[in-house]
Amino acid sequence: IPLIKKIINNKNNQVIITFFSPSGYENFKYNNNQIFKTYIPLDFNKNAKDFLYIINPKHAIFVKYDLWMNFIEICHKNKIPTTVFSGKFHNKQWYFKFYGQWAKNILKNLTNIFTIDKASNDFLRSEGFQNVTFNGDTRYDQVNTNLINSSLKIKSPCLILGSSWVKEEKILSNVIDKFPDIQYIIAPHEVNKKRLNELQIIFGSKSKFYSQIDFSKEIPNILIIDKIGLLSDLYSLSDIAFVGGGFTGKLHNIIEPAAKGNKIIFGPNHKKFPEAQLMIDNEIALTIKDEFDLMEILKSIKRSNTNRKKSIEFVLNKKGATEIVYKAIMNKN
């Protein structure tokens, strides 16, 4: 989104965004007459030729792992500049195996490759790539570090369980009674009748739904969010964010709570997410494997402006990746 916004700042530019899955297509909503969305056909040579002939792009942009080899090759043959950003590369990917050499050679024809981490940059250079730049993660440019005021009477310290699944919820529920002075906010990844019923069972009678609270009074100790679209603002109110997905290898957004100054907690399966290890290395995030790890963290929880500032500064220092990609794209058009 940050890159798209920069491109359409010029009223002469138009962007076609392609999707392969119906869920991605249907969930993307952006009301602007410079932006169009469509499905991308299967990555066959003829499909790529026909599709690119119809849309006639000035520049083709690929994100992360969505590397469509026939499309990249046809772009190269037709002298259409190509850019990959937020790329992550390593020796276990198929195009760096002996049977993927043909794909590796196609990737070398990309005009620009911007990597999300230095390890990817160094690996590509060791494989003979020249068109590589390490610029970081454009998602840092998308988050806002400004804190919001809220009518919720939240006590401090506050822990928010964000984008949670049952695994994280059960871990937290096992320690809540041991730390009654902490405010708990539960924001599940899915908000539907089945999940809300599960949450009521897990957290019991001491919990209350957001839709039931009286804003003029202090909220209950365990608040369950049963409305979508609130999580980003709620991170402004919390001190610690326990983010879901870290036990399944599908870690949810940890950049957003860091931008609001939270200390971050997540499960141990985070290898696919370079930002997770970066935050651990910078001491603004911790990983846990069970309720006992969580208890050790909660024993020392306190509201600290120093900790909040450290998380926000981490995010601010990572901003700027979008501008680098944008300038490269505009210079090639």
Where are these regions (language model features)?
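Nucleotide-activated sugar donor-binding and catalytic core shared by glycosyltransferases
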Residues: 1-333
